[in-house]
């Protein structure tokens, strides 16, 4: 008994001495960047993609020896925290990263449900935050410190409506969306608005919905098919897209199907197969036939993690690069975290024509990016082929 | 009329999933009086096991050129067998130690086992969603404007077959009789030489096997598997199982079909945004009028949690 | 737990006590009254406030370990000894010293206080407790957020315990009540105090907001209570399993209703609330809820709920109006769930119908059944333990969701009704002085 406690005490003190040596090297200036990702919870895939992308970015930085500010290189540390895809956890995590870990900027959370309350936290602590994926206008509205990496529903919805009108001249459309999820819902609404402005009242002949996690859409699709619509708009995530498109084909739908940027994942084709061939969707980049840094990014990612990155990866990458650019533009890294955050925010707002994986972008005063969208057609080989580019 | 018939067929397919899962719920619920909240996740595990088995069979028999339906039948049988072990294991770990505890505690254990199943699933298969292999080539028949696929026929037929088989088992065999006896009283029946430690695992095994069958059929109809697919379906099947009434296993199947019909037809008649609202209001009203489900007997004092 | 298991455990525990000599080391803790604990923590908090940073620096920690070092332990295992040493120095040492040397004096003080009327000394204790919490939380905003959400979890757990524990129903509608409360309270504060795209200009200047916030919360609570009638009325004729799905259906209905109400923002949620739920507000509401719920369950109607749980027919025969009991209990519990929802909405400054789903329900169930049925202390322990564990295990990511269920299953197997079930909560006993014979 005595021996055991002696050994335990010895171990304790050795470890203690080891850890205490921390204060010899502990007070080095480190740039900390927080990643607020849904690693567990409803959307673990999004969290994993965010984490993977962030790690790839960190690798780059480490290879370069850190981020260079005013001619001096500083090491970077990522603080990756799990928000469990829950609003309250996202708030806790953001508070923790900002007040405890003293990150200079936060990347994430991804979906609006977490990004809106977390954005409130970031704004109240005057810490710049970039949400790569949140499309809800409330995320950045009246919040000077909150930015986002993707384009907004009010741009994407009308753009798709106009595209169909110019390209095909259809006048009757049907929409099928998830009423319990804010991204599809917002997009569906803006699409409907724009379509009815183009083609007159009642030209969206069928406007149907379901609830998250539903798998059977046959009733809604039967309604849509019977309504005589000429095109079906499905602003859904890729797992639902596969089910909807397959069921639509089984119920006899042969007309075009239109999607949104959430289709832009290699899994769309893996899950959906040949049923999705010939469909159009808007996105940030076309992975087949991509050029320049986009291609480079896709190839690297694919090599490292052995799957083609989706829009979450690309947007997170761009957000990280934006943050990096803003930090690099600092006049000096003072170590006074408040001052640095303020300057980073100022730099972020001033970024113009940033060349990202998802296209060139600048920020509006609200913190929303202005960038072009691409219409992609899924070819008969299952590749995303560039079809058309639309700029605001 | 076409429109109605088309939706009728849609509802038949959707309802058969609820029915199959509700049957498994109802087995445990009627015989052992437990809420098996892990059932939705057993269904999910069944689907994943089915995916593994199907991939294995396709890999083995792909070269030989075995017909798809044979692979499908084999997959269903093997996965049902394997998944029933999960059921037995859950009974042993989660429910047997709690036999004398309040029933609500067992319900909580079930909930926790469900979370463990989901998490370990992510740990094994990763966060990626998985495409279930199309075992049977989809053929669409157009009969007077109604679209029916061969898959729909297969799904409804297999689930009806399983239900009939279960009914036969419960009503005609010795084991079935033991189960029915157990549902009357599981304090006295063990004294008659029927061991609860045999009947309870058997009940769980059969329930889980049915869930596995449902999982594979689900994979055929909706070929995207994700680790959380069992949660909502499980809770809804739970509604169906209890709606059917305690002590009535086929009542659960009927209630499952009814739930499917309510969901599909409310979406057909009303704006589909209001589907959940109306469908669950209907269930609330049904239960207010018939407080013991469709086929349940009124014995409220024994229903304490 | 079966008696024989209990006996073995108890014996082992006793043996352990003798072998390690717990009694010798920790004996003097048993003579310490509640006031002593408060004094101990007070001194700990003061020490942390004054020199916490220096101690942390000396121990090689980057900052003071906010949640007792849980957060850094799992991320940087090398810092574990430092964090442990910090806890020993800052928390355990003052506590032990207070217990060792000041027990007698504090006991005398506590005895003096105890002679005052109970409301007076209870308020004194609460103020003292709040001062400690405020200083402790004031050192880091992360502590404040965690504490606020923990307090809200306490209210939720207590109110569900009233239905599930005291009345013995299995109600799955609690997140529905919470959603109703959150939405109604937010609507009131948004209409009155925020320039908002949903409801237009603010009607009142925002400096009035903190004063009218309780009214908004009460409106939220009342809305939830009225909503609960939808569950309570069918409960006249049925119970147990059927009531479980009635309440589940109710939860789906509320969620779907909010998703369809464009006025409330639908699935997009409702944001822009003022951060009105600050720490004192949440603290006061939590204390209020504990006090009132405790009074409720010890009142005649509270005893009636127990009777309804144990045997409804017999209760009826004993002239208990079971219908009235059920309605009142449901409305009462739903009221507090609504208040908790309102506070929750004003902590996050955003509500979304997706938040109030099955996942949240499972969380509340876990807290109730972990802590213990039919017990106020149990609920508090359940809520605090779950929230702390949830924060502490966060760095484990996926494995957190294996560890928490496993713990829960073990608790259910060895203590099927929860850790501290069927305990009366008597504030006088807790605050009584100890040791003097």
Residues covered by each model-derived region:
Chain A
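Extracytosolic ligand-binding ectodomains
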Residues: 2-16, 20-392
């Amino acid at each position: 008994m005595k021996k055991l406690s002696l050994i335990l005490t010895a171990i304790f003190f050795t470890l203690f001495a080891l850890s205490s040596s921390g204060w010899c090297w502990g007070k080095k200036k480190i740039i900390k960047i927080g990643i607020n990702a849904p690693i567990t919870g409803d959307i673990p895939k999004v969290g994993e993609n965010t984490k993977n992308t962030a790690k790839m970015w960190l690798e780059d930085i480490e290879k370069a020896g850190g981020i260079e500010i005013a001619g001096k290189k500083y090491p970077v540390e990522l603080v990756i925290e799990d928000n469990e895809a829950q609003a309250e956890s996202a708030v806790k995590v953001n508070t923790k990263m900002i007040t405890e870990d003293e990150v200079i900027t936060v990347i994430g959370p991804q979906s609006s449900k977490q990004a809106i309350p977390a954005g409130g936290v970031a704004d109240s602590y005057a810490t710049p935050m970039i949400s790569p994926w949140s499309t809800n206008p409330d995320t950045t509205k009246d919040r000077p410190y909150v930015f986002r990496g993707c384009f907004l529903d009010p741009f994407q919805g009308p753009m798709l409506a106009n595209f169909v009108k110019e390209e095909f001249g259809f006048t009757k459309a049907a929409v099928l969306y998830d009423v319990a999820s804010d991204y599809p819902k917002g997009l569906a609404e803006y699409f409907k608005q724009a379509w009815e402005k183009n083609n007159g009242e009642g030209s969206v002949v069928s406007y149907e919905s379901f609830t998250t996690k539903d798998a059977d859409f046959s009733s809604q699709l039967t309604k849509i098919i019977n309504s005589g619509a000429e095109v079906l708009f499905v602003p859904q995530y890729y797992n639902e897209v596969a089910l909807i498109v397959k069921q639509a084909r089984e119920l006899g739908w042969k007309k075009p199907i239109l999607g949104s940027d959430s289709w832009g994942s290699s899994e769309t084709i893996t899950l959906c197969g040949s049923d999705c061939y010939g469909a159009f969707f808007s996105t940030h980049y076309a992975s087949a036939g991509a050029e320049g840094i986009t291609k480079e990014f896709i190839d690297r990612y694919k090599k490292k993690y052995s799957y083609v990155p989706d829009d979450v990866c690309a947007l997170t990458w761009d957000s990280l690069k934006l943050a990096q650019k803003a930090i690099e533009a600092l006049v000096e890294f003072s170590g006074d975290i408040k001052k640095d955050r303020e300057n980073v925010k100022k730099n972020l707002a001033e970024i113009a024509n940033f060349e990202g994986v998802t296209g060139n972008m600048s920020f509006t005063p609200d913190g929303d990016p202005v960038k072009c969208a691409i219409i992609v057609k899924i070819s008969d080989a299952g590749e995303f082929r560039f079809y058309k580019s639309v700029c605001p | 009329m076409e429109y109605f018939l088309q939706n009728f067929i849609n509802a038949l397919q959707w309802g058969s999933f609820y029915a199959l899962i509700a049957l498994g719920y109802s087995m445990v619920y009627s015989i052992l009086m437990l809420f098996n909240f892990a059932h939705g996740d057993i269904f999910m595990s069944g689907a994943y096991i089915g995916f593994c088995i199907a991939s294995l069979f396709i890999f083995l028999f792909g070269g030989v050129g075995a017909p798809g339906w044979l692979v499908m039948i084999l997959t269903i049988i093997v996965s049902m067998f394997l998944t029933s072990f999960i059921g037995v294991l859950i009974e042993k770990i989660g429910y047997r130690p709690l036999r004398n505890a309040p029933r609500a505690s067992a319900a909580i254990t079930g909930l926790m086992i469900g979370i463990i199943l989901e998490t370990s699933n992510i740990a094994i298969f990763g966060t990626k969603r998985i495409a279930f292999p199309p075992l049977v080539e989809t053929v669409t028949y157009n009969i007077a404007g109604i679209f029916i696929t061969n898959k729909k026929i297969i799904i409804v037929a297999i689930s009806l077959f399983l239900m009939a088989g279960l009914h036969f088992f419960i009503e005609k065999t010795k084991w079935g009789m033991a189960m029915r006896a157990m549902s009357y009283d599981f304090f006295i029946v063990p004294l008659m030489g029927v061991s609860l430690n045999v009947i309870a695992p058997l009940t769980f095994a059969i329930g889980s096997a049915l869930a596995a069958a449902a999982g594979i059929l689900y994979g055929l109809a909706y070929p995207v598997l994700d680790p959380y697919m069992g949660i909502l379906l499980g809770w809804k099947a739970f509604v169906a199982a209890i709606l059917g009434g305690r002590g009535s296993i086929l009542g659960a199947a009927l209630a499952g079909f009814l739930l499917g019909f309510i969901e599909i037809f409310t979406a057909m008649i009303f704006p589909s945004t209001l589907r959940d609202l109306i469908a669950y209001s209907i269930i609330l009203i049904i239960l207010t009028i018939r407080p013991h489900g469709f086929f349940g007997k009124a014995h409220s004092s024994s229903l304490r949690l | 737990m079966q008696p024989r298991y209990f006996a073995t455990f108890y014996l082992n525990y006793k043996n352990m006590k003798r072998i390690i000599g717990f009694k010798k080391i920790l004996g003097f803790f048993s003579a310490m009254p509640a006031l002593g604990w408060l004094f101990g923590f007070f001194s700990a908090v003061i020490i942390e406030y004054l020199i916490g940073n220096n101690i942390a620096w000396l121990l090689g920690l980057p900052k003071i370990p906010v949640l007792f070092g849980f957060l850094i332990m799992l991320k940087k295992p090398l810092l574990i000894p430092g964090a442990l040493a910090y806890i020993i120095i800052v928390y355990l040492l003052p506590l032990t010293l207070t217990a060792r040397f000041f027990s007698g004096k504090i006991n005398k003080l506590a005895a003096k206080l105890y002679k005052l009327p109970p409301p007076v000394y209870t308020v004194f204790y609460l103020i003292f407790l709040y001062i400690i919490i405020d200083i402790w939380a004031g050192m880091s905003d992360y502590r404040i957020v965690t504490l606020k959400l923990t307090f809200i979890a306490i209210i939720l757990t207590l109110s569900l315990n009233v239905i599930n524990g005291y009345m013995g129903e299995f109600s799955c509608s609690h997140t529905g009540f919470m959603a109703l409360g959150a939405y109604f309270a937010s609507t009131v504060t948004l209409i009155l105090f925020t320039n908002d795209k949903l409801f237009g200009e603010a009607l009142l200047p925002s400096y009035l907001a903190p004063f009218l916030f309780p009214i908004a919360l009460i409106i939220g609570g009342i809305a939830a209570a009225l909503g609960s009638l939808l569950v309570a009325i069918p409960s006249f004729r049925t119970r147990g399993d059927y009531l479980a799905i009635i309440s589940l259906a109710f939860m789906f209905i509320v969620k779907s209703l909010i998703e369809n109400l464009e006025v409330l923002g639908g699935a997009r949620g409702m944001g822009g609330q003022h951060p009105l739920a600050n720490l004192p507000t949440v603290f006061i509401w939590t204390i209020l809820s504990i006090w009132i719920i405790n009074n409720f369950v010890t009142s005649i109607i509270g005893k009636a709920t127990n009777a309804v749980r144990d045997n409804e027919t017999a209760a009826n025969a004993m002239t208990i109006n079971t219908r009235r009991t059920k309605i009142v209990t449901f409305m009462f519990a739903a009221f507090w769930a609504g208040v908790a929802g309102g506070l929750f909405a004003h902590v996050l400054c955003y509500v979304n119908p997706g938040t109030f789903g099955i996942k949240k329900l499972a969380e509340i169930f876990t807290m109730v059944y972990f802590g213990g049925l039919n017990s106020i202390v149990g609920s508090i322990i359940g809520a605090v333990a779950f929230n702390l564990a949830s924060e502490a295990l966060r760095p484990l990511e996926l494995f957190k969701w294996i560890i928490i269920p496993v713990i829960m299953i073990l608790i259910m197997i060895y203590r099927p009704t929860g850790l501290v079930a069927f305990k009366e909560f008597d504030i006088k006993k807790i605050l009584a002085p100890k040791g003097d014979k």
